[in-house]
Each structure stands twice: as C-alpha cells, then as structure tokens.
Design a protein with these regions (language model features):
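Long, positively charged leader/targeting segments at protein N-termini
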Residues: 2-56, 61-64, 109-482
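Eukaryotic helix-linker segments that join adjacent hydrophobic helices
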Residues: 58-119
Length: 482
C-alpha cells in the first residue's frame, strides 16, 4: 500500500483546526535532516513555543478511548492488543494508515485528527529495519547485526499474528490479507514503517508516559538542545526554550533524545548517529559454553538475554564492562553451584538455584557478589575476564573482517544509499575503537589476576595434582617384558 502524503505547507492549517498553537516557530525542511522546527522570531524565556491539546496526544489511554468509538477497532485491539503501549499505538496507526489510503474500501475505522496527520509523516525513516537487504549487510560485524536481524524477525511475527487474528474478523480480513492482485490495504512493510515512526518519535512524558505528540515530534535532536517538552496544568504538551538558551530568528529549535544513548541505539531508533555524543558503549550477545552440562539450566534460570555491556567515556580514560551472565557462566558444580527442582506451596515444581547450599534463585544476576564466598574468588573473576575478553576479541576480528565492502555479498554497491553507508561506517569505527580500548584494559586486569597469590597457589596445586595423577596412571601400566 502506497502511503498517502500531504505537503508540509498544509500543516499550519491542520494545526489551527485541531487547536495546536505555535506562534513563535514553524516547521520547515532542514538540509540533511528532513523536517525540523525553526524559530519565527527572537524567542523569550518561559514563553511556550508550542502547545498541543491533550486530546491529540497518542498513548494507551487515547487508544482505549478510540476503541470505545470504533467497535471494529475494539475487536482487533482485543484480539492482538493489550500487550504493550507500543503494540496498541501501532494498531491504532495501522488503522489510520488504512483510512488515509485512497485505495481503502473496507468499512473499518473512524476518522480522527491522526488520520490526516499521518499524511505529514515521512514515507521512510533511515533506521536499519527500513534499509534494503544489501544495506543491512553493511552492519555485519557491528553490534546491530544480530539486533536488527532479531527485530526483523519479531516484526514479521507480530504482523503475522495481527493478520492471523484478522482472518477471523470479517471487517478486517479484507484489509490485512492480499487481494487477488497481490495488493492489500496494509502490508508487512506498513507495519515496519509504523514501528520505525513510533521508535523515532515517541516521547516519555512526565504524566502521560510513552506518547506520540503531533508537531512536537517534528523537532530534531541535538546534544546542545535549545528546548525541552513538558506537560502543563491543563495537560497540554508544551515546548519551552531552555533557560540558558538563546534562540535567534531562523535558528533551528532542538531537543535532546538522550545524551547517554550509544551510537548503535541512536542508529537503531532514530536512523542517525550523533557525532557529539560523549559516551561510547555497545551491547553484545553472549553464548554459554557448548560443553557446559548446566548450560540449559543456567539459561532457564537467568531468564534475561545473556549479554556483555562495555562503555567508555570520551572525556576520560575510564572504561567499564558488565556481564552478570558471564559470572553465572563461569561457575560450576565443583565451585558450589547446584540446580534443584523443588515443589512449591501450590503443588507446582520450580527450578531453584543454590550456591554453596544457599538458595540464590532470586539473586541469579548477582553472582559477581556471590562468588566472594568462594575459596578463591579471584580465580572465578579470572575466568570471567577471560571469557569477556575472548568475546570482545571475537567481535573485533569480525568487525575488522567486514570493514571492506568487497568482503560483503552485496549485489550492486551503487544502489546503496550514502546515508546508510556513512552511518554503518561510523558505527563500525566507533565500536572498533571501543573494543580495542576495552580489550587492552581487560588484558591488564587478566595479568593482574594471574599474578594474584591465591590464583598462583591454586593453579600450582592443580598442576601438582595433575602430575601426581599422570604418575599414578603410568605406575599402573603393565610392564613390557618383550
């Protein structure tokens, strides 16, 4: 389904009709950024730049209210909604996209202001889920490679679930399933686009929580933001200049999407990387040892996704890493780890985790502290540091191996968008530099742990025990009298 569009010049009329006021700013095309908000005169402190009525704020409460007006939408919402704010808002936007389509014929949906506003939103966003397959290959060797693949799988499963539910709802069956010519009022691509619009535009409001706010969602990001959003006593969402900012006529008005977001998260959610960000960090998935007999039990008990998080503050030499699962991964039965299936008070059976005879099921992510009760905690720390270092080294080598386009199975390089190539290259450069710094720091920590007197004594005793075992086995071999 082709997304309908309206020229941005028509936005002031739509805003006036729906009670949005922005007398001191205007929405305009910003070179290299798409749409943005610029001042329409010298701005004064404490004077709102924009005010949006609460009735236009799109959140879970607004979706529930809309469901009361549209029984057909309520059927769809009850069938596949109520999982999260995001899912409910996406279902609402899907209906508005269908209603706004000229090809729409099915008797579903009730028009509201968002039916028109969605026509002002971009037809694509430069987030990786909307890159072509060849463009997504540019992310090989970066932390986004697995994240984007997982997101694409999840989005496909989500839309399949929506369509499957729609098949039993007569009013929605024709909308979400292809016609004889193969077209449909809404497609998987529509769902992926709406997800991208949501992730790149959602705001965390002080009172209303996760919300999309028309017009305010046109404002671009800057680490040196000149404005911020809030909710006033009338529950309007307002845009205010920052107290320390001076915005001249014609200057772009910006807000901060979050100063601490890493490059991968910025690209994943917003489609760009802020080169002025002061924090470099990345998150990598972590796999348990293949030969660990307790691997499945550890994964089941841990529940969360096993990962390694590393970070570096550009303003200092300090680096940090964190991986709760790595600590669980590196302890075994001989250290004092045990899994037991016990019966609960209701007669059910539960997998419980024990560490040195103490039930630590509710502290499964706190083994960094729990290992202090081990005879040689520095030994386990050495194992963990080695595991994390090897995982980062593996990632670094992979990132470097795909740095050249010739190493990627891309069909036609000329079809790759420059924005995607530049973003992927910058992400790879940032993450490669970060990995090198953290690996070097981990090597220093590993050497220090290897020199620890308790570790040296333990490793020495293990070598002695192994030598004795080898000697004992040799003495038990029958003599050869030939």
């Amino acid at each position: 389904m082709a997304q309908p569009g309206l020229p941005i010049e028509a936005l002031p009329a739509w805003a006036l009709l729906n009670g949005i006021t922005f007398p001191h700013v205007k929405v305009a095309n910003i070179e290299g950024k798409g749409f943005g908000v610029v001042s329409d005169g010298d701005l004064k402190p404490d004077v709102p730049l924009m005010a949006v009525p609460n009735s236009l704020v799109l959140n879970v409460q607004a979706v529930d209210e809309y469901a009361k007006e549209d029984k057909n939408f309520k059927q769809l919402l009850d069938a596949v909604g109520h999982h999260s704010a995001r899912r409910d808002i996406l279902l609402f936007l899907l209906v508005q996209l269908v209603l706004a389509s000229k090809a729409h014929q099915a008797p579903v949906g009730v028009s509201n202001p968002w039916t028109e506003y969605i026509k002002f939103l971009p037809k694509t966003v430069l987030v990786p889920t909307l890159w072509t397959e060849d463009e997504r290959l540019l992310l090989r060797g970066t932390s986004l490679e697995s994240a984007v693949n997982a997101k694409m799988t999840a989005l496909t499963a989500e839309f399949d679930a929506v369509r499957e539910a729609a098949s039993s709802l007569p009013s929605w069956n024709d909308v979400l399933w292809p016609y004889e010519d193969g077209n449909s009022s809404a497609s998987l691509r529509s769902w992926i686009l709406l997800d991208a619009l949501y992730r790149s535009r959602v705001l965390e409001l002080p009172k209303s929580g996760e919300s999309m706010v028309p017009c305010i969602d046109m404002i671009n990001h800057s680490t040196s933001a000149s404005a911020y959003y809030d909710e006033n006593t009338k529950d309007e969402v307002i845009l205010l200049p920052r107290p320390d900012s001076k915005i001249s006529s014609g200057e772009e008005v910006t807000i901060s999407y979050g100063d601490a977001k890493p490059a991968a998260e910025m690209l994943f959610s917003y489609g760009f990387i802020d080169p002025e960000s002061t924090v470099e960090s990345l998150v990598l998935p972590l796999e348990p040892f293949e030969d660990d007999p307790l691997a499945k039990a550890k994964l089941f008990a841990f529940k969360d996704m096993p990962k390694v998080h590393v970070a570096h503050d550009k303003g200092s030499s300090a680096v940090s890493w964190n991986s709760p699962f790595a600590y669980l991964m590196c302890v075994n039965e001989e250290d004092g780890l045990d899994f037991r299936v016990l019966q609960d008070s209701e007669g059910g059976r539960q997998l419980r985790v024990f560490w040195r005879e103490e039930d630590v099921t509710d502290r499964i992510g706190d083994f960094e502290s729990l290992i202090q009760s081990h005879e040689v905690p520095t030994l386990i720390k050495l194992r963990v540091v080695t595991v994390v270092q090897e995982r980062l080294q593996q990632q670094l080598e992979r990132a470097q191996s795909f740095a050249d386009l010739s190493a990627l199975p891309i069909g036609d390089v000329d079809l790759l968008r420059d924005e995607c190539r530049q973003a992927a290259s910058l992400l790879r450069s940032i993450e490669t530099g970060l990995l090198e710094v953290v690996i070097e720091d981990l090597e220093k920590e590993r050497r220090m742990l290897l020199a620890d007197e308790n570790v040296v004594a333990y490793l020495g005793s293990m070598e002695t025990a192994e030598s004795d075992l080898v000697g004992e086995e040799a003495s038990n071999e029958p003599e050869d009298f030939s």
